[in-house]
């Protein structure tokens, strides 16, 4: 009955509200028989406090299943596995990375090497000491003559000979031209990977000029086989030193243009600063050398600490980084190019006259002019190039400061005309081993910047 009375009261209110001309205001006096009830404070307080009071019924309460049939399961989120390379344009050859990504963040980076393995160290054991030389051009095929220099120094140490001064100055001159070749490739391809195309085209024009110097002195643009045990293959042609001087004078302007484009570029700095940071302690533990070691703040350059050829007679500075990131290593490479120009200028000024091969008929072939008149010279030349020369038994580890780092040759002789063992220590191998450590926690795009700053060539890594 009470419900019916309440319903009747509501009908009366609705009739008054809907009457034409009436406002939306409720009547002040309710209809007869209707009581208006407002919830009092005591009644509202019983619903305050916690949502669920623990009681016998609610103590063992569990939320109902989501779909009333199956209970919810813990979903396992898996990281994505990505194959980077070996045909990736930013992989610099045949690098294959098996990467584990969480979103776009790198959790693991596993380099797979060996795709350019050619068995160089074993092949050298079946060749004479001179025939083994061209294999070294094909190791780090961006800095060719530096590899030849390391091997030649190792053989000379076993033979206990020293090339004449002019040959040593020519070696240093072309060693620094080779350093320019390598650093141009390293910096411009690094920039190209990060989106800056212009430096690549500007500086590769300069690189072609240096290939021309290679060609004029040896006949080959890349695999020169010019620096040989006992000296160099032939003397510098007329006019070459003048052209190298003109080139080195103009090249510093190209470097200024490169730095205008990159050094203070906001995008370049964002992509390289604090990317791939390696502390000095980590760099030593991983066995870094070259720019990778100096970028972390350790001043170690074999041209200064253990000079070979005539590096103790030239003046140059060793640039050192402070943070150990990609930006510091870029700055080190640019400054090394400027120091190489200093060394080239000193080589041109101090180049002495004289012989370019050691005066030892057991090692050096006779002159071409002699071979045209003397049968003995022709036989001597033939025997040297077919049988080779015997090297006294012994072992040596000889290292040079190649553009990428410490390039070492461990050479063992058993007294024959062929090496018993030739172990090649490539700098890029140790650098690639740290790729997992350097890229962990970075974005996928930063891995490209880290590969570029490591300056890896797979001829020397895979051997």
Swiss-Prot record:
Q: Which InterPro entries match?
A: NADH_Q_OxRdtase_suD, NADH_UbQ_OxRdtase_49kDa_CS, NDH1_su_D/H, NiFe-Hase_large
Task: State the Gene Ontology terms under molecular function.
Answer: 4 iron, 4 sulfur cluster binding; metal ion binding; NAD binding; NADH dehydrogenase (ubiquinone) activity; oxygen sensor activity; quinone binding
UniProt-annotated location(s): Mitochondrion inner membrane
- Write out the PTM section of this UniProt entry: Dimethylation at Arg-118 by NDUFAF7 takes place after NDUFS2 assembles into the complex I, leading to stabilize the early intermediate complex.
PTM sites of type Symmetric dimethylarginine: 118
Q: Extract the PROSITE patterns matched here.
A: COMPLEX1_49K
Membrane topology listed for this record = Peripheral membrane protein
UniProt lists the gene as: NDUFS2
Required cofactors, per record? Answer: [4Fe-4S] cluster
EC numbers on record? 7.1.1.2
Q: Relate the assembly described in the record.
A: Core subunit of respiratory chain NADH dehydrogenase (Complex I) which is composed of 45 different subunits. Component of the iron-sulfur (IP) fragment of the enzyme. Interacts with NDUFAF3. Interacts with NDUFAF7. Interacts with CERS2.
Q: Which residues carry this modification: N6-acetyllysine?
A: 62
Q: Which GO terms describe its biological process?
A: cellular response to oxygen levels; gliogenesis; mitochondrial electron transport, NADH to ubiquinone; mitochondrial respiratory chain complex I assembly; neural precursor cell proliferation; neurogenesis
Sites binding [4Fe-4S] cluster sit at 326, 332, 347
On whether Oxidoreductase is a keyword of this UniProt record, the answer is yes
Indicate what this protein is called per its UniProt record: NADH dehydrogenase [ubiquinone] iron-sulfur protein 2, mitochondrial
State the organism of origin: Pongo pygmaeus (Bornean orangutan)
Cofactor: record remark:
Binds 1 [4Fe-4S] cluster.
- Tell me what reaction this enzyme catalyses: a ubiquinone + NADH + 5 H(+)(in) = a ubiquinol + NAD(+) + 4 H(+)(out)
């Amino acid at each position: 009955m009470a419900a019916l009375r309440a319903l009747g009261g509501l009908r009366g209110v609705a009739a008054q509200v809907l009457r034409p001309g009436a406002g939306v205001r409720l009547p002040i006096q309710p209809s007869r028989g209707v009581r208006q009830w407002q919830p009092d404070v005591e009644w509202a307080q019983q619903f305050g406090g916690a949502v669920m009071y623990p009681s016998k019924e609610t103590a063992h309460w569990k939320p109902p299943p989501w779909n009333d049939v199956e209970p919810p399961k813990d979903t396992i989120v898996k990281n994505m596995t990505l194959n980077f390379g070996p045909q990736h344009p930013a992989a610099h050859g045949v690098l294959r990375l098996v990467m584990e990504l969480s979103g776009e963040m790198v959790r693991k980076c596993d380099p797979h090497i060996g795709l350019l393995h050619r068995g160089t160290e074993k092949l050298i054991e079946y060749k004479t000491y001179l025939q083994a030389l061209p294999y070294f051009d094909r190791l780090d095929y961006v800095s060719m003559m530096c590899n030849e220099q390391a091997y030649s120094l190792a053989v000379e140490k076993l033979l206990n000979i020293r090339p004449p001064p002019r040959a040593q100055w020519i070696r240093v001159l072309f060693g620094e031209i080779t350093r320019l070749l390598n650093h141009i490739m390293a910096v411009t391809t690094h920039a190209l990977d990060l989106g800056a195309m212009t430096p690549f085209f500007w500086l590769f024009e300069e690189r072609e000029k240096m290939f021309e110097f290679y060609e004029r002195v040896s006949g080959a643009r890349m695999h020169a086989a010019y620096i040989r045990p006992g000296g160099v293959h032939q003397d510098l042609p007329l006019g070459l030193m003048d052209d190298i001087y003109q080139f080195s004078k103009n090249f510093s302007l190209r470097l200024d243009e490169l730095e205008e484009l990159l050094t203070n570029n906001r995008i370049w700095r964002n992509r390289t600063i604090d990317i791939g940071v390696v502390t000095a302690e980590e760099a030593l533990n991983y066995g870094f050398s070259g720019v990778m070691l100096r970028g972390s703040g350790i001043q170690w350059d074999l041209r200064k600490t253990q000079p070979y050829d005539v590096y103790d007679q030239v003046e140059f500075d060793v640039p050192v980084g402070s943070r150990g990131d990609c930006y510091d290593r870029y700055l080190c490479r640019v400054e090394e190019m400027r120091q190489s120009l200093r060394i080239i200028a000193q080589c041109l000024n101090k180049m002495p006259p004289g012989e370019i091969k050691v005066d030892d008929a057991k090692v050096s072939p006779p002159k071409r002019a002699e071979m045209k008149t003397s049968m003995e010279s022709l036989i001597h030349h033939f025997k040297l190039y077919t049988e080779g020369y015997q090297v006294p038994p012994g072992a040596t580890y000889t290292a040079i400061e190649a553009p990428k780092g410490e390039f070492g040759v461990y050479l063992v002789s058993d007294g024959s005309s062929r090496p018993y063992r030739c172990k090649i220590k490539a700098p890029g191998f140790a650098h690639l081993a740290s790729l997992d450590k350097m890229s962990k926690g970075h974005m996928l795009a930063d891995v490209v910047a880290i590969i570029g700053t490591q300056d890896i060539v797979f001829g020397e890594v895979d051997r």
